[in-house]
Amino acid sequence: MHIIHISKFMALLAISTIAIPTRGRSEVDSRDVNQAQTVTSGSSIAPSGSEKRPAWKAEFAEQIAEAQRDKKPFQCPHCKDGISNRVALYTHVKAFHGDKPVYSLKNYHDERRFDS
């Protein structure tokens, strides 16, 4: 019993040591940031939101969206969201749509297409 309490205390101590910044560690972190800022000649580290999307991303946006839809073979019949598997579909419908029926609209139409 005491071993469990001691191990919990040691884990808590280890987490708190990592989470609380010390004087030495904060100086190292700030120095790294200052060096990164001087390398970029005073420009901000994070890119600004006003930058335009690269041309190649705009060109292939539809193909990227189609590939993402293909990775999710199930579709919620209520909100048309793409879902990756049956368990996720069941969980999604129960969580967001309550007592509505659980079935996949995309698979229903695919099966009917192959039956004809």
UniProtKB/Swiss-Prot annotation:
A GO molecular function held by the record: zinc ion binding
Biased composition (Polar residues): 33-47
Keyword line: Host nucleus, Metal-binding, Secreted, Signal, Transcription, Transcription regulation, Virulence, Zinc, Zinc-finger
Region (Disordered): 24-53
Main location class: secreted
Record's function text: Probable secreted effector that translocates into the nuclei of host cells to reprogram the expression of targeted genes by binding on effector binding elements in rice.
Name used for this protein in its record: Host transcription reprogramming factor 4
Native organism taxonomy: Eukaryota, Fungi, Dikarya, Ascomycota, Pezizomycotina
Gene symbol of the encoding locus: HTR4
